[in-house]
Each structure stands twice: as structure tokens, then as C-alpha cells.
């Protein structure tokens, strides 16, 4: 059984394979490699874009957290200012109420004092009138001391009943 190689056929197959390889590399392999390079470049760009988007997202999240913290601080400050303002207003209201009460008290005391002075003045006028009346009657009657004392006591008793 011999294993004979047909050298003409082998050479022909080698030549055909070389020509096929040449044409494949010239017309099929270069465009295929170009497509693969473009695909690799596109994938690299997408990876870069995704990485950039991730970094931008992290920066945005950090900014949002900072803005949220700032908003919380401002809200707390507003609440504290509102508390202080309400306390101040409460104190102002109490102070105004005390001032009004003091003013009303002083007005009432002044009114009482005026009425007291009017009562004393009226009493003086009555006493003066009674004194004149007593003096007139004393002169008219020309009483002795005991009768005069009795008459004064009667008039004082009358004055006490009128008051």
C-alpha cells in the first residue's frame, strides 16, 4: 500500500490556497479587521461615556446631598427664628398687657382720688353750711353753753345721718 503523493496536485492545491489566502486577506480580512477595530473603538467610547456619566452622576448626587443639607440647615434656622420671634412677640404682648394694666390701675387710682377730693369738698361745704346755720341759730337764741353744746351735738347727729 503505498502512499504516493501526487506532487502536481499538491503544488496546485498549495498555489490555489495561497491565491485564496491572498484574496481573502486583501478583500475580506482587511474590511473584517476594520469593522472589528471600529467595533472596538465604539465599545471603548461607550465605556468612556459610561464612566463619564457615572462620575457626573456621583458629582450630581453629591451636589444634591449638599443642597439637601443646606435646605435642612435653612429650615432649622427658619424654625429657630420663628421660635425666637414668637417668644419675643409673647413677651411683647405680656409687657403691653402689664403696661395697660398699670395704666388702667393708675387711672383708677386717680379717679378714686378725684372722687375722694370731691367728697371731701362736698363734706366741707356741708360742714361750712351747717356751721353757718348753727352760728345763726346760736345768735338768734343766745343760748347758754350747755344749750349751745346740746344744739351742736344735735346738728352733728343730723349731719351724720345725712352722710
Curated annotation (Swiss-Prot):
Keywords: ATP synthesis, Cell membrane, CF(0), Hydrogen ion transport, Ion transport, Membrane, Transmembrane, Transmembrane helix, Transport
Topological type in the membrane: Single-pass membrane protein
MF-aspect GO terms: proton-transporting ATP synthase activity, rotational mechanism; proton-transporting ATPase activity, rotational mechanism
HAMAP family tied to this protein: ATP_synth_b_bprime
Entry's family note: Belongs to the ATPase B chain family.
Subunit organization: F-type ATPases have 2 components, F(1) - the catalytic core - and F(0) - the membrane proton channel. F(1) has five subunits: alpha(3), beta(3), gamma(1), delta(1), epsilon(1). F(0) has three main subunits: a(1), b(2) and c(10-14). The alpha and beta chains form an alternating ring which encloses part of the gamma chain. F(1) is attached to F(0) by a central stalk formed by the gamma and epsilon chains, while a peripheral stalk is formed by the delta and b chains.
Protein name stated in the entry: ATP synthase subunit b
Annotated source species: Alkalihalophilus pseudofirmus (strain ATCC BAA-2126 / JCM 17055 / OF4)
Higher taxonomy: Bacteria, Bacillati, Bacillota, Bacilli, Bacillales
Amino acid at each position: 500500500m503505498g502512499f504516493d503523493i501526487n506532487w502536481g496536485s499538491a503544488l496546485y492545491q498549495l498555489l490555489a490556497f495561497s491565491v485564496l489566502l491572498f484574496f481573502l486577506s486583501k478583500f475580506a480580512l482587511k474590511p473584517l479587521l476594520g469593522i472589528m477595530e471600529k467595533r472596538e473603538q465604539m465599545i471603548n467610547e461607550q465605556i468612556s461615556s459610561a464612566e463619564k456619566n457615572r462620575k457626573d452622576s456621583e458629582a450630581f448626587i453629591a451636589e444634591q446631598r449638599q443642597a439637601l443639607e443646606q435646605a435642612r440647615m435653612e429650615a432649622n434656622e427658619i424654625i429657630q427664628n420663628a421660635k425666637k420671634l414668637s417668644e419675643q412677640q409673647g413677651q411683647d404682648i405680656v409687657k403691653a398687657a402689664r403696661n395697660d394694666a398699670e395704666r388702667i390701675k393708675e387711672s383708677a387710682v386717680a379717679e378714686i382720688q378725684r372722687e375722694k377730693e370731691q367728697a371731701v369738698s362736698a363734706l366741707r361745704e356741708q360742714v361750712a353750711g351747717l356751721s353757718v346755720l348753727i352760728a345763726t341759730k346760736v345768735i338768734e337764741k343766745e343760748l347758754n353753753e350747755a344749750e349751745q353744746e346740746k344744739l351742736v351735738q344735735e346738728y352733728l347727729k343730723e349731719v351724720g345721718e345725712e352722710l
